[in-house]
Amino acid sequence: MGSSSSSSLNNSPIRADSMVTPESQMTVNDNKNDNVSILSPSVKKSFESPRKSTSIPANNNLTPVKSRWSFSSSKKSFGSKDETFFDSQPWLQSDSDDDFHSVNGDFTPSLGNTPKSSFSDRPPRFHNLIFHEKKPSRGSSSPAPLPRRKKLGELFRDSIREEREESGSSSAISTPYLSGANSREFNDTAIEKEEKKKSNWHHHRCLPGFSSCGGSFMERRKKMSSETPVVAVK
């Protein structure tokens, strides 16, 4: 068995002495028939490990590329430091509109830095200035109500009554020695006459009198007809 294995090694095309190690670049065989073999750098690289061949040579001009799962990328994916800071602060959530009004430097809650009791205990100044009415003091008396304005008809009635009273007083003064029955009849007749005069006066005041206008118009027409000469027709 030993002789057969040695003979097979001698007959194989690749001989043990022609094997080249990575350190040696050139090997010279003892046999005269074999030529000198020079290995190129590419052949040398083929014998090296595959990890070294895939590695990128270091270059001073180029900055090294960071891996995909570096710390900076993971930091961006989970949010920056500022974002986490603002997210950690709870916002004040309130349904009432009083918390968000600010007049003359009143408190307006923004990020919950102040306690809730500072704006919940006292109402804001906005409502005190506008909506809350000023309470009257105890010593001040209530203002007197304004007098009601009279209508036009009421004013006419008052004037007629005043005139009647004045006329009655004047008639009583002018006839002091009349009896009771005669004085009453005289007063009634005087009042009726005055009412008729007032009614006529009101009618004349509201509507213009056409009698004067009509008379003047008829007179002018007669004058015109008299002045025009009569032309005889042949």
From Swiss-Prot:
Give the Polar residues compositional bias ranges.
21-40, 52-64, 105-120
Which spans does this entry mark as compositional bias, Low complexity? 1-12, 66-77
Family annotation (InterPro entries): At3g27210-like
Q: In which tissues is it expressed?
A: Expressed in stems, rosette leaves and roots and weakly in inflorescences.
Q: Where is the composition biased (Basic and acidic residues)?
A: 152-167
Q: Region Disordered: which residues?
A: 1-184
Q: What induces it?
A: Rapid but transient induction by wounding, salicylic acid treatment or pathogen infection.
Q: Quote the subunit structure annotation.
A: Interacts with RLK902.
Q: What is this protein called?
A: Uncharacterized protein At3g27210
Q: What are the leading ranks of the lineage?
A: Eukaryota, Viridiplantae, Streptophyta, Embryophyta, Tracheophyta
Give the gene name: Y-2
